[in-house]
Amino acid sequence: MAVKWIAHIFNSRVIGISIDEQSRGTVELGEHTITADWVIAGDGADSAIRKGLGIAFDGMTYPERFLVISTTQDLTELIPDLAGVNNISDAEEWLVLLRTPRHWRALFPVDGTADAALLTSEAAVQARMQRVAPLPVGYPISHVTLYNVHQRVASQFRLGHVLFVGDAAHINNPLGGMGMNSGIHDAVAAADALASALDGDVSALETYAQTRRSTALDFVQAATHRNWEQLQERDETVRLEREARIRATAADPVAAREYLMTSTMLAARPTDRGSDVS
């Protein structure tokens, strides 16, 4: 397959799409319009292409919002044995601490109806971080983000010559880090399916749509929601039973490998022509 040309158009927002009789898509990008035989829509959770084609995006919104605080303070200086990613289950307030290249990031669940200005104020942010680990001089805060959290999947991942990938196709809570990774899997599988279609195997497109949607529903949505349920569990008996299961899994090489294959998404990685391995 020869690529005739590639063009990058930056600082443009997708406004909409129209489909002609030959199934070609014309994508509107503000000052630009592009007509193509095939379209891979990766324009995010608010996908103008998905909405323009009338594809449903069903699911649910969590009752709480997530508050993310980024600091340049090295948390390993304050908390011994801290890992790069830490899911902290607590009967009063769960949280996530994770290392990024330039920051430590703390994620907290907060009241979905509380005033956003109060939640993100300097005093409130410092108070939350001080509960994580006391720091008398205060935390250097790089940025604060407050957002709603959803679990949603498009009713179809393909409409004619349009394929959907990433957040345009499915969104989930960030617990487990599966959102971006599954979106990358989508892109790999969609590119492979499109290459097959251009070589004459159009059935690869439907295989892509069905397998990636099933993966989003049965694997990503299920795993991330389970992570949320486990972190916010308050029943001490249930919490202790889960800890015992985790320790038993870690002590069993076969069970540990199976667990890691799932949690790292290797068990759901795309293979040739959009299919998945189990």
List where the protein language model places each region:
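Conserved FAD-binding catalytic core of PHBH/FMO-like flavoproteins
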Residues: 12-15, 24-26, 38, 42-145, ...
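Short N-terminal helix/helix-N-cap motif within the alpha/beta-hydrolase-1
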Residues: 19-22, 50, 173-174
